[in-house]
């Protein structure tokens, strides 16, 4: 594909629920700003190579590649009837079955994209929290806000148990993003 795929909304939330890395992830500062991606301070050599950068890759093939990768991380396949992605323009929404495109018609604020594989980015949890208002109930979103500002995480996808972990964001971080 010519541009990276950016996971957003519920797909990003699912990703963040299974991929709690112990090391910081590589951050890209803007969705379509080639300079910000080229000047990454952290090397991307250790990122998984999924084949999303192949010339002439069909979108339907990309859906399968991304879905397989997410399943390999532990996301149940039945949660992936569609993959939420972020696009810049409304005309980019015409995609094959499997992608659900959400228009974000401005550059993504610096630091709010995380590169998880070559050609695959995910919005960070601050941005995902704001997007969650489109599909979570108010109590669910409130719980999610507590989780990302607290020192624990509820593992929604497997055990349903709370896990202690370092604080990821502060309330001020969320307010600054909004």
Regions found by a protein language model. Give the residues of each.
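Short gly/ser-rich loop at a beta-strand->alpha-helix junction or flexible surface loop bordering the NTP-binding
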Residues: 1-178
């Amino acid at each position: 594909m010519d541009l990276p795929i950016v996971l957003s909304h519920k797909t990003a939330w699912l990703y963040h629920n299974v991929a709690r890395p112990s090391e910081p992830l590589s951050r890209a500062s803007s969705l379509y700003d080639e300079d910000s991606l080229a000047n990454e301070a952290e090397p991307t050599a250790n990122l998984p190579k999924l084949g999303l950068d192949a010339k002439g890759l069909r979108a339907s093939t990309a859906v399968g590649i991304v879905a397989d990768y997410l399943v390999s991380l532990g996301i149940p396949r039945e949660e992936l009837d569609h993959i939420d992605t972020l696009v810049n323009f409304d005309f980019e929404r015409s995609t094959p079955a499997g992608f659900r495109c959400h228009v974000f018609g401005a550059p993504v604020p610096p630091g709010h994209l995380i590169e998880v594989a070559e050609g695959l980015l995910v919005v960070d949890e601050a941005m995902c929290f704001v997007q969650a208002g489109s599909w979570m109930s108010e109590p669910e979103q409130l719980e999610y806000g507590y989780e990302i500002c607290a020192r624990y995480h509820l593992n929604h996808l497997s055990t349903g148990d709370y896990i202690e972990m370092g604080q990821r964001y502060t309330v001020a971080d969320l307010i600054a993003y909004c």
